[in-house]
A protein has these predicted regions:
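Short, solvent-exposed loop/turn segments at secondary-structure junctions
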Residues: 21, 48-51, 85-86, 100-101, ...
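Conserved helicase core region in the C-terminal RecA-like lobe
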Residues: 65-103, 126-132, 136-142
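Helicase P-loop NTPase motor core
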Residues: 1-72
């Protein structure tokens, strides 16, 4: 994802790097807990496996996003799902955890000639995720951040925990 010009006013996305995954999950939980009663907050993830990993950290009232948007009503609350499930929707705060180099792109079962295609697909998915944020975007990772996000430090408010 190579930004040319920022199309939106507002704060830079936060990019928070963790030493361990449990601390990352706890920050996601804290961000959702702080804001979901007054704002729409979405936790967007790459895979259903990651959804299962984060679900226990979310409020019991959190709503799973589905690709079929029938009956969708916007409003404050906690939402979670895949990047695909959020397509076409917007949220006040979007949290995108697990953006480490080891998770995205997922090259675990790929052949060398598939790497470029998989990376392009994952870049498109990241684009869908980051563009769901109306006012705040928080990106998190444990270890090194994926190379699919721009490396320019000027684009983020970076921190480590």
């Amino acid at each position: 994802i190579v930004p040319i010009v920022s199309a939106a006013d507002g704060p830079k996305p936060a990019l928070v790097r963790f030493a361990d995954a449990e601390a990352e999950r706890k920050l996601v939980a804290s961000l959702v807990e702080q804001r979901y009663r007054t704002q729409s907050v979405a936790v967007l993830l790459r895979t259903h496996e990651k959804i299962r990993e984060i679900k226990p950290y979310l409020p019991a009232s959190a709503v799973l996003l589905k690709e079929e948007k029938g009956g969708w009503t916007a409003g404050h609350g906690a939402y979670y799902g895949t990047y695909h499930g959020a397509k076409g929707l917007e949220f006040d705060l979007v949290v995108m955890p697990f953006l480490s180099r080891e998770n995205i792109p997922d090259l675990s079962d790929s052949e060398p000639d598939e790497v470029a295609e998989i990376s392009a697909d994952d870049t498109g998915l990241l684009y869908v995720g980051v563009t769901r944020a109306k006012s705040s975007l928080v990106l998190t990772c444990t270890g090194d951040v994926t190379e699919l996000l721009p490396a320019d430090d000027a684009l983020y408010n970076r921190s480590s925990r």
